[in-house]
C-alpha cells in the first residue's frame, strides 16, 4: 500500500502535465482547423490529407513544447514548484490567444503575426487579445481540474498513447512534405505556408541518392500537372 502511494504521488505532477497537454492540444488543434478552412483543398488524396495531418501534428507538438518549457524549470527548482501549474496554464492561454489572433490576421491578409506586424496593432486589437487571454485562462483552469481528475483515474498507458499521437502525426506530416517536395508536388507542399512557425522537412538530395525519387521524372510530372491545371 505504501509503495503504491509513493509511486502515485511521484507520478501525479507528470500525469497532470501529460493530460493537460492532451486536452490543450485538442483545443489548439480544433482552433487550428481554421487554417484548413481558409485553404483551398486540392483534389488528390495526399493533398486533402496533408493539411489535417500537418495542422494537428504541428500545432499539438508546439503546444506540448510550450507547456513543457513552462512546467519543467519550475518543477526542477524547489522554490518555484508552486508556480508550475499557474505558469503552465498561463502559457497555454497565451499560446491559444496568439494562435487565434494569428488565424484572424492570416484569414484577412495571408501573412502571420511577427514582431513587426504586432507593432502595427491598434488599441482595439490589443483589447481583443486581452479579452481572449482572460477567457482562455478561465478555460484552461477548468481543463487543469479535468487533467488532475484524469491523472488520478486513467492509466499511464492511455496518456502515453494519446501524447504520442501528435508526435506520430508530426513525423508523418514531415515525411509527406519531404516526399511531395521531392516530387515537386505543390498540391501538398503549398499548405505548409498556412501554418505559423512551420518549417517543413525537405530531403531532395537524400531521396534522390537513395533512388526513391527520380528528379527528372518528378520534374516532368510537375510540368504535366501545370499543363493540366492550365487546361
Outline where the language-model segments fall.
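Transmembrane and membrane-interface helices of multi-pass
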Residues: 2-207
